A protein has these predicted regions:
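Residues that cap or initiate secondary-structure elements
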Residues: 22, 51-53, 71, 83
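C-terminal edge-of-domain segments
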Residues: 62-83
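Intrinsic-disorder/low-complexity, polar/charged segments enriched in Ser/Thr/Lys/Arg/Asp/Glu/Gln
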Residues: 13, 40-44, 74-76
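A generic structural signal for short, solvent-exposed coil/turn residues
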Residues: 8-10, 37, 57-59, 69-71
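An N-terminal amphipathic alpha-helical segment
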Residues: 1-36
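Short, structured protein-protein interaction patches enriched in aromatics and acidic/basic residues
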Residues: 43-64, 69
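Short glycine-rich, basic-tinged beta-strand/loop micro-motifs
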Residues: 31-47
Length: 83
């Protein structure tokens, strides 16, 4: 995978793949997507590891993360604006 995040839209909504990026680039890419308003309500992120430092940042911005089924060696989270 290249050293850049990938975005696409599937039947279940928008996706952001940050696998292959070195910390803190995955968190920066995810927060940029939220802060920039690219996704207003929800999207799925694909990561290599559990983003423990991301969770407090999401709470601060009014978002929640829910784990979803993923391939072995992948962490997949559905990020949604808290209601």
């Amino acid at each position: 995978m290249s050293a850049a995040s990938r975005r696409w839209v599937a039947a279940d909504g928008a996706h952001l793949d940050v696998r292959g990026l070195k910390p803190p680039e995955p968190m920066v890419a995810i927060l940029s997507m939220i802060d920039g308003g690219a996704e207003k309500t929800a999207f799925t992120v694909h990561l290599e590891r559990d983003p423990v430092f991301l969770y407090p940042e999401l709470v601060e911005r009014g978002w929640i993360a829910t784990p979803v089924d993923a391939d072995p060696g992948e962490v997949r989270l559905r990020l949604e604006r808290a209601r």
